Curated annotation (Swiss-Prot):
Its main location: cytoplasm. It catalyses: CMP + ATP = CDP + ADP; dCMP + ATP = dCDP + ADP. It comes from the Bacteria. InterPro entries: Cytidylate_kin (IPR003136), Cytidylate_kinase_dom (IPR011994), P-loop_NTPase (IPR027417). One of its GO terms (cellular component) is cytosol. GO terms for molecular function: (d)CMP kinase activity; ATP binding; CMP kinase activity; dCMP kinase activity. Its EC number is 2.7.4.25. This is Cytidylate kinase. It is found in: Cytoplasm. The gene is cmk. Belongs to the cytidylate kinase family. Type 1 subfamily.
Length: 223
């Protein structure tokens, strides 16, 4: 069985990271959460009170405090800037509400895409994000475009936030997700869109295992 590159794209809270982690584990592939990288850059910008126009300052910060990944004792992904663990802070609502703006900065995307492509050269990989199949890994053997209704995605995010102890409101989440969809699909640099050769998968009404099995079946055809 050969190792392949699997690119999973889709809007916010469509279940990309959850299924990508499981698929990577099942196949023994590396998992890379590219969204966490943009969240890390956003966290750095907010922490240092940098606006979207202060690009040079943000790039300098990312050089001084490189984004890296690790694993906890239970196998969960950890995110670092420099040697500081920011795994939990990057999931706060303030970061979530600003990440689209930071991710739309061409120079930031260029820097992080280069890092993502470097990591992908190491063998079998599952990568999820907004532009993996179109920009980061256009040569990936399997591209998946994962979608779900705004209502379902808001419910998922609501349950995640409650489980993490993050104060949240369902109706507000629906508005935020719809607004983020618009920003992600209308930005000039690497907008969210389906790659021509991607498999379209609507996960509305499906549980995680059902989605995983559908993607694994597609992957096995290509191995």
């Amino acid at each position: 069985m050969k190792t392949i590159q699997i690119a999973i794209d889709g809007p916010a809270s469509s279940g990309k990271s959850t299924v990508a982690k499981i698929i990577a584990k099942d196949f023994g592939f590396t998992y890379l959460d590219t969204g966490a990288m943009y969240r890390a850059a956003t966290y750095m910008a907010l922490k240092n009170q940098l606006g979207v126009e202060e690009v040079e300052a943000l790039l300098a910060l990312l050089d001084q405090h490189p984004i890296s990944f690790g694993r906890s004792e239970t196998g969960d992904q950890l995110v670092f800037v420099g040697d500081v663990d920011i795994t939990h802070p990057i999931r706060e609502n303030e970061v979530t509400n600003h990440v689209s703006a930071i991710a739309a900065i061409p120079e930031v995307r260029e820097k992080l895409v280069s890092l993502q492509q470097e990591i992908a050269q190491q063998g079998g990989i599952v990568m999820d994000g907004r532009d993996i199949g179109t920009v980061v890994l256009p040569q990936a053997e399997l591209k998946i475009f994962l979608v779900a209704s705004v209502d379902e995605r808001a419910e998922r995010r609501y349950k995640e936030n409650i489980a993490k102890g993050i104060e949240t409101d369902l109706e507000t989440l629906k508005k935020e997700i719809a607004a983020r969809d618009y920003k992600d699909s209308h930005r000039e640099t690497s907008p969210l869109k389906q790659a021509e050769d991607a498999v379209y998968l609507d996960t509305t009404g499906l549980n995680i295992q059902e989605v995983v099995e559908k993607i694994k079946a597609e992957a096995e055809k290509r191995m």
